[in-house]
Amino acid sequence: MTPRGRIAGPRRRAVDAVAALACSVALCALAPRHAHAQVRTADPIARGIPLTSFPRLVPLGAGVYGYEEIRAPGFTTVSLVVIGDSGVLIADGQGSAAATQRMLDEIRTVTSRPVRWYVVGSDHGDHTGGNGVLPTGIRFIVHPTSRAQLRRDSAAVVPPVAMTSDREQVDIGGRTVEVRFLGRAHTGGDLSVLLPRERILFMSEAYLNRVFPAMRSAYPSEWIATIDRALAMEVDRYVPGHGFIESPAVSREELVTFRDAVRDVVANVQGLHARGLTAEQAIAAVDWGTYKDWFLAAQQGPIAVRRIYLELDGKLAAAR
């Protein structure tokens, strides 16, 4: 006999099942409709980010920011901003005086400390073109290869001295920043910036997030090894030179994806070279597969083929 008002046995279990189902339906109804995986792309529109959101500072830690600015044809150029007690360190600038000035103005919204250090992660103009507006007396940290290239390019600013080793520690007051040369990749002098405390590595153009591997001055096979060295480091978050800054876990996944893209592009072209095709024939025949939809694939694909042919033919030393 059961107490009055209670339901026993199979009827009780049936009622419980109905109640559980009702709760589940209600929770589904309350769940946010936008709770879905972020689209993996360098296209801000496809990611649901309006262009009016840029430029923007992306907080990465206490006194650490990524800076994302939109450049033609519609993807980001990324800089790193690190604030110390003695001043601010920037890694990579932007492609024009106006764009770099906007970055400096944005930095002033989060700190009044002076910009005192600048790391040349990439010597390409889309990262150095605005260096003429940097503060007078700023200290440049640059790889010797990149310094020589800036001089050949008649850049507006050529740093007076270059690094003398593959690693340099910079005390910016209350924190130490490590500048690393991990190997040739997108250029002959790519520098990365490590924040050991935050376990963040800014890789400049050695890491292009969902942007087709741009190789006009690259060392294709060495690029793969350089990324592998970065992946072996004690780092939680990898910050690219182009494409979006991701969460720590996604940043590692995307760096692996980019490493695989470089490897696959190189292997694809090696196969065409082995078949005896000329570079121009290879450009006509190549199939990039899923990478054909990445930013700049149509523009950078032919450049990559020609550069890899130079490497395979032992002619990179004579090229830029």
Description of each model-found segment:
Residues 224-277, 281:
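Divalent-metal (often Zn2+) His-rich catalytic cores of metallo-beta-lactamase-fold enzymes
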Residues 91-93, 116-124, 141-145, 182, ...:
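Active-site neighborhood of phospho(di)ester-bond hydrolases with catalytic His/Asp-centered motifs
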Residues 41, 59, 145-189, 196-197, ...:
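Metallo-beta-lactamase
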Residues 57-106, 191-195, 200-203:
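Conserved beta-strand hairpin/beta-sheet module of binuclear metal-dependent hydrolase folds
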Residues 274-320:
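C-terminal regulatory/interaction regions
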Residues 16-29:
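Bacterial N-terminal signal peptides
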Residues 98, 105-172:
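Active-site HxH/HxHxD metal-binding segment of metal-dependent hydrolases
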